[in-house]
Amino acid sequence: STSGEGRAIGSTYIEGGFAKRILVSTSSHNMAAEKQFRNPTEYGTPKPNTATFTSTGGVSILLSNKKSKVKVESSTIGKVVDMGTTDVNHMGAVMAPAAGDVIYNHLKDTKRDISYYDLILTGDLGIYGKNIPKDYMMTKYNIKLNDNYNDCGTMLYDLDRQPVLAGASGPACLPLVVFSY
């Protein structure tokens, strides 16, 4: 996500002494994304339940070299993990193996156990993609994601009351939850 990448790069600049304060911002808009990248809204094409709903919002965070209880302690950058999923209306399934892989690599790199964290979040896998990292990590690494795991795509909207299909998506999804929940 642009927010995560911005935090990783910005905190590295601050740690290296190249900056004192860095503002990291990201945004997404439902109708702009739908019209530009997905099914054009003018078509009125129905979407399958696995499709997600691009979140509308903007988030900015200020990174600073001042000591605080809240800090960027580490960053783990992921990679593409292609399991052959090609359904463009089920992006959660496309992204989920990479989410499981980056969680595993973070645990390995930091020499930590899953129970170290109060909360582990994925960005926008949605209700149908949310459980795939659980299965992936158990099958591939014998690691069980516990109740401390959730997906921001399932947290941003009230899935029972708002017509957002499989949940929220887009670059603002995770930071909208993390920095305002």
Show the residue positions of the predicted features.
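A generic, well-ordered mixed alpha/beta core segment in the N-terminal half of proteins
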Residues: 1-51
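Short acidic capping loops at alpha-helix termini that bridge into adjacent secondary structure
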Residues: 20-21, 113-116
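Generic preference for flexible, low-structure residues
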Residues: 35-40, 88, 133-138
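Short, well-ordered, mixed-charge alpha-helical segments that flank or form enzyme active sites
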Residues: 30-35, 80-84, 129
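Short linear motifs at secondary-structure transitions and domain/linker junctions
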Residues: 34-40, 94-97, 168-173
